[in-house]
Every structure is written in C-alpha cells, then in structure tokens.
C-alpha cells in the first residue's frame, strides 16, 4: 500500500474494529462482510486495493471465523496494518504501542468525524473518475454511507476497552502478495459485492433493521 491509501482509511478501519460487537449476530456479521467488500472496492489506490484484498483473502483462509468477534476483527486490522508497515520497511507496532498511538491520533470522540471525512474524500475522488470503474463505485459508496448512518454512528467505544485483547497476535499476515490466489491448493476467492448490494431499511435484504443492536 502507498500514501494513496491515506491515514483516514486506517482511522476508519481501526475505529470500526473497536465498534464491532463482542458477539455479533449473524446479521451483524453479514453486514460487516458487505461493508468490508464495499470498503475494499472503493480504495482509491489500485495497488493498495489489491494488497488489502489479498490480506483479507489470506487471513480468511487462515482464520475463517475471524468476523465472529470484536477480538477477531481487532486482530485482523492490527495485523493488516503491520503487514503494510513491514512491506514498506516501517516500524511495526506492538498491541500496546498501537493503542497508545490510536489514543493520540484518533480520540474516540473524533472517530465518527474521521470516518465521515474518509467517505467524503473517496466520494469526491471517485466522482471525478467518469469511467465504468469510477461510475460502478457509486452504489458501494452509498452502501458505506448507509451502514455508517444506520449502524456505526449509533455505536461508541473507548480505546481502553480493547485492553482485554492485549494477548492477540499483531504480527504481519503471512504469505500476502499481490498475486495471491491460492494457498495449499485451496482456492482463495476474491472479494465481490453480493448482487443487489445491502440495504439498511425497515426490512432490508438480510433482515429487519431492528435486528441490529445499537
């Protein structure tokens, strides 16, 4: 990943991992999976998008149930971030160092603002791209906005809450490369948007809005 990824993207990922429920319902896990697809496919830097998609695929192959808990999502995001740091020959952060940095650069009270700034940034940039690829991102950006408005923005967190996960593995994700398509002979599917997208309405495509806990 390059500077094109931007600190706002990582701020969004880290805050979402902190907001994720400790024991998400099946609906919440499906919502997060779809959010992750839209997030990945709207990354502005093509190589960053490729690297992140590969990281998700590799990690899911190693740990298929990682979306079933906040612990799992926090671990994935920290390992993905350290994977980028390792690739770019930058400092890799321990869990404690990561939390200290996040408390400084992303106070929990400012997290919703940073996520909105990220959404505005990618929307503005993609709307300048009048190609088929650029136009096709519009539904994904709308989906990110809808999930932010109806779910993430209604939740809150404090960084200290994550101290219970101090024993998680934060090392770089192994075997992540831009050409990753399989591992051990088993196909790793690329991320793709489910047909019709995801709607958070009174009765959405995968269940009632009331099933999502605030």
Where are these regions (language model features)?
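Mid-to-C-terminal functional-domain signal that highlights helix-capping/loop sites
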Residues: 1-42, 46-214
């Amino acid at each position: 990943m390059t500077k094109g990824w931007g600190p706002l993207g990582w701020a969004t990922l880290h805050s979402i991992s902190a907001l994720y429920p400790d024991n998400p319902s099946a609906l919440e896990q499906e919502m997060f999976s779809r959010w992750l697809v839209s997030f990945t496919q709207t990354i502005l830097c093509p190589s960053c998008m490729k690297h992140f998609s590969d990281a998700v695929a590799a990690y899911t192959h190693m740990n298929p149930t990682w979306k079933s808990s906040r612990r799992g999502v926090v671990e994935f995001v920290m390992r993905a971030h350290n994977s980028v740091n390792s690739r770019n020959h930058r400092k890799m952060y321990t869990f404690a160092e990561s939390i200290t940095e996040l408390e400084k650069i992303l106070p929990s009270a400012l997290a919703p603002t940073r996520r909105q700034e990220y959404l505005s940034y990618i929307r503005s940039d993609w709307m300048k791209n009048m190609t088929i690829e650029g136009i096709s991102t519009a539904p994904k950006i709308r989906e990110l906005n809808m999930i932010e408005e109806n779910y993430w923005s209604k939740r809150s967190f404090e960084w200290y809450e994550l101290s219970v996960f101090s024993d998680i593995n934060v090392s770089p994700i192994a075997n992540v490369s831009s050409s990753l398509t399989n591992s051990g002979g088993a196909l790793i599917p690329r991320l793709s948007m489910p047909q019709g997208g995801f709607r958070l309405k009174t009765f959405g495509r995968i269940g009632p809005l009331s099933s999502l806990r605030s």
